[in-house]
């Protein structure tokens, strides 16, 4: 039996869980107050605070660090890598602390795991990090040579969904062609073929607008805004990725509240319908690049809990193929199972430095 500690930081909380083989034994969402977090300039600076919270959880559930066979951590913004399970080592930790191109809370997980596990010789791993890049060559072109499209997505949940759906079909991930739409505070819509994410919108910069992100914007207007604005580049980036989308239009990040408002507000109705329209359009594009009719179109993520909203999307896309809805995220299970496959010898863990060099 393998006992695995799972660590998955979010913007204002850290999800932690204990698995014994495939079975989840304990789970908790460790919340961090805005007052606590605002003391830190960068996400990575929160590491001691969040590590202490994880240590307290371990004590609370009656374990010691040395009781674990391994630690599974959410993968941060690393250099582009193929999907898989990667060993957390000093090189990866240094990259996440000092060289990651994006200041994101996901960068914390591997650092926390390494500082917890290394003194006791506990192996630590990340699974399908945010920067999984398996895009086909054609998908990389942006329109100008100086800019290449980047693959930043909700890869962990997307890969978990791919495994789940293919297993239900009695096939391997390499044998199916599916489109996955992960709908959360950010949106990733991708085409999966031969077990790989061959195309995906960058969840920060492209695709549909979401709960708090603008998605793709007209280039001319972005340039005009940047040069006529008194805001810094960092402030504009925050405007586009944390203050855009549904929040900018309706002043709320609560999709359910926005859906309820549709009954009395024409504006709310139009905004929510526009978001569904843009998601459906992105799904249609991904269906096209698969080359064949998809085996399934999967809608997942937090927004997939809202049946009314899912229906708006499926009205557009059901003509393209079978639609399956998997609400929420499979991230904790995906992290544990990715590490379990390595511990059982079913899959070989990858060395991050070797892969990128």
From Swiss-Prot:
Broad class of where this protein is predominantly found: cytoplasm
Its EC number(s): 2.7.2.7
GO BP terms: acetate metabolic process
Molecular function in Gene Ontology: acetate kinase activity; ATP binding; butyrate kinase activity
Highest taxon of the lineage: Bacteria
Catalyzed reactions: butanoate + ATP = butanoyl phosphate + ADP
GO cellular component: cytoplasm
Location(s) in or outside the cell: Cytoplasm
Top enzyme category: transferase
Keywords, in A-Z order: ATP-binding, Cytoplasm, Kinase, Nucleotide-binding, Transferase
PANTHER family for this protein: ACETATE KINASE, BUTYRATE KINASE 1-RELATED
Similarity comment: family membership: Belongs to the acetokinase family.
Protein name (database record): Probable butyrate kinase
């Amino acid at each position: 039996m393998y006992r695995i500690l799972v660590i998955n930081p979010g913007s204002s909380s850290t999800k932690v869980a204990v698995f014994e083989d495939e079975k989840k034994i304990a789970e908790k969402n460790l919340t961090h107050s805005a007052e606590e977090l605002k003391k830190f300039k960068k996400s990575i600076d929160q590491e001691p605070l969040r590590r202490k919270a994880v240590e307290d959880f371990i004590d609370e559930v009656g374990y010691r660090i040395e009781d674990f066979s391994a630690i599974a951590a959410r993968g941060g913004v690393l250099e582009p890598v193929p999907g898989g399970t990667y060993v957390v080592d000093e090189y990866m930790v240094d990259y996440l602390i000092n060289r990651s191109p994006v200041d994101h809370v996901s960068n914390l997980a591997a650092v926390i795991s390494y500082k917890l596990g290394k003194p006791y010789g506990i192996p630590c791993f990340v699974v399908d990090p945010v920067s999984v890049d398996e895009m086909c060559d054609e998908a990389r072109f942006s329109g100008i040579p100086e800019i290449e499209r980047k693959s930043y997505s909700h890869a962990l949940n997307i890969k978990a969904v791919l495994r789940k759906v293919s297993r239900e079909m009695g096939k391997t991930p390499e044998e199916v062609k599916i489109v996955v739409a992960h709908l959360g505070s950010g949106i990733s819509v991708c085409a999966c073929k031969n077990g790989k994410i061959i195309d995906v919108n960058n969840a920060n910069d492209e695709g549909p607008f979401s709960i708090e992100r603008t998605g793709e914007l007209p280039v001319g207007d972005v340039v005009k805004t940047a040069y006529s604005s008194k805001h810094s580049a960092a402030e504009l980036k925050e405007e586009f990725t944390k203050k855009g989308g549904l929040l900018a239009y309706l002043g709320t990040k609560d999709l359910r509240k926005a859906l309820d408002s549709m009954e009395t507000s024409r504006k709310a109705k139009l905004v929510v319908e526009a978001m569904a329209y843009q998601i459906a359009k992105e799904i249609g594009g991904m269906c096209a690049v698969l080359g064949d009719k998809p085996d399934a179109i999967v809608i997942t993520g937090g927004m997939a809990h809202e049946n009314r909203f899912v229906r708006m999307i499926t009205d557009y896309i059901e003509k393209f193929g079978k639609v399956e809805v998997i609400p929420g995220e499979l991230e904790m299970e995906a992290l544990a199972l990715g590490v379990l496959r390595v511990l059982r010898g079913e899959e070989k863990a990858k060395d991050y430095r070797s892969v990128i060099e």
